[in-house]
Amino acid sequence: NAFLGMGDDCRLLLQTFDEYLAGFLKRVGKDRAYSSYDNYRKRRNRLASFLEYEYRVKDIAFKELKRDFIEKFVVYLSSVQGMRSGTIHSTIKKLKLMTYTAYKNGWIPADPFAGFYVRPEYSERRYLSASELQAVMDAELPNYRTGINRDAFVFCAFTGLSHADVVKLTHADIYTDDNGERWIIDRRQKTGTQFRVKLLPVAEMLYERYKDTYRTGEKVFPLKGTYKTLNMSLRHVARHAGLSFNPTIHCARH
């Protein structure tokens, strides 16, 4: 009963996480991206799996959380789930957000995980050189869908748009000024901050390639699938372009 938090004055960990997710979901499409929501949801599910694995419970009261809980959680993520340190670091940050919330709301007298830190060990991220980007642009691809994904990648490279921003980009977000130059005027999916980006020749060429599908509000790039499936498609692009590594859509921005 102590783990389950019996009593009206007990707040539960996953209960609080679920409330946070519900609030986050309401902001998706406004100042939050669905991909960020999905990231939090997956971390929540890892935590639920750990509670079942280690304690055989569906939830746990904040007042029952001690230092060894988070230490065991790190071991579980590494040994059972096979996560790397960067992903573990991200998962622990989400857990610590919940305990900090509990502390700030007065549900517990102190944050049990304050000062706990997992050092991420990221591998060096590769970026495309000018010649590699040109190879991607010139690659002969096997099908239309892979071509769309390649074009979206190149468009991001010449505009600095993120995956979330290019997915939601519509023809209505692109304006032509008095000089005949085209600009993207939109808001960042993740932060809600307005931005303006002038279309350089390559980006404008790609826009022209797809603008014949124009209808009010229609997306510029008819992308399907998730961030993960797009990156899987880019692996095929990399192979046809003769690249020595597999770029992700994030690489396009740098």
Where do the model's predicted regions map?
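Short, surface-exposed polybasic/aromatic micro-patch for ligand or macromolecular engagement
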Residues: N1
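Short basic/aromatic active-site micro-motif
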Residues: L65-D68, S90, I148-A152, K224-K228, ...
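Short, aromatic/basic-rich helix-turn unit that serves as a nucleic-acid recognition element
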Residues: D8-N45
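N-terminal DNA-binding recognition helix of tyrosine site-specific recombinases/integrases
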Residues: S35, R46-Y53, I60, D68-E71, ...
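Basic, Lys/Arg- and aromatic-enriched nucleic-acid-binding interface segment
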Residues: S85, H89-T91, I108, P112-H163, ...
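Conserved tyrosine-mediated DNA breakage-rejoining catalytic core shared by Y-recombinases
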Residues: S123-R126, E132, T159, K168-E208
